[in-house]
Amino acid sequence: MSGHSKWHSIRRTKGVLDQRRGQLFTKLARDITIATREGGSGDPEANFRLRLAVDKARAANMPMDNIQRAIDRGLGRGGSDAAALEEIYYEGYAPGGVALLIEAATDNRNRTASDVRATMTKNGGSPGEPGSVSWMFETRGLITIDLSVKRLDPDEVMLIAIDAGAEDVQIEDDIVEVYTDFKQLAAVRQQLIAAGLPVTGAEKTMIAKTTVQPDTADALKAMRLIEKLEDLDDVQKVYSNLEITSELAEQFVSG
C-alpha cells in the first residue's frame, strides 16, 4: 500500500508527530489561513476548504485560540498580512527515481526554495523544473475512516463508500482511506457521515498515476529524504510515487 495512512503510521511509530507538535500546529495554522483567504470567508460552514482545515486542526488537538488567530490572519485582521503567505509546489526526484511533489506554504519564496533544494541535494535527491513530475500525479479527495473508533466490518464500510461515490478504497489495519473525485469530496464525506461511519479526516491529496518500487536501499533513502523534507518548517506535505510495502515500512522504522 502506498497510501497516506501508511506513511502517517510510520511517522507516528517513530514518535515524530508527538515530538514536533509545535511545528505541526504552525503548519495547520497556515492551512487555515490560506483556506480562509482563498475561500473568502472565516465561517467553516460557508467555506468547505476551511472546514476541512479546521477539522484537521481539531483532530490534532490544536487550541481554539490558535485556530481563531489563523482565521483572523486569513481575513487580514489584527494587522497580520495573509497576502504574504503563498501556497507553492516544488518538484524533483529522490534516490531510485522516486518522483516527489512538495507542497509548501511560505512568506518567503527564496528561503523555502533554498531549504528544499539544499535538503534534496544533501540527501541524494535532485531538484526538478516546474512540470517535471507534477504530470505524474492527479488531484483527489481523501476521506479517512478510523475503525478503532467504531468497530465495523471493513467490507461493509467499503461497500458503503463505493455506493457513496468513492473511486477507490484502501484498508490498512484500522484505517480506511476513501479516494474520491476532488469535486465530490464534500458530497461523499457527508454521505459517509450520514451512514454513521467514523470519519476522522477529509482533505485534498495528490495521487501518483503509477507507483515505483526501487531496490530496498534506494527506497529507504527516498523515505529518509521525504522525512527530512516534511521536517522543513515551510513544507506542508510531500507526495511521492513510492510504493511502501509493509516490509519496507518495518525496515524504515527499525532503522
From Swiss-Prot:
One of its GO terms (cellular component) is cytosol. Transmembrane segments: none annotated. It holds the Pfam family TACO1_YebC_N. GO terms for molecular function: DNA binding. The keyword Transcription applies. It is found in: Cytoplasm. GO terms for biological process: regulation of DNA-templated transcription. Keywords: Cytoplasm, DNA-binding, Transcription, Transcription regulation. Belongs to the TACO1 family. PANTHER family: TRANSCRIPTIONAL REGULATORY PROTEIN YEBC-RELATED, TRANSLATIONAL ACTIVATOR OF CYTOCHROME C OXIDASE 1. This is Probable transcriptional regulatory protein Rcas_0718. It comes from Roseiflexus castenholzii (strain DSM 13941 / HLO8).
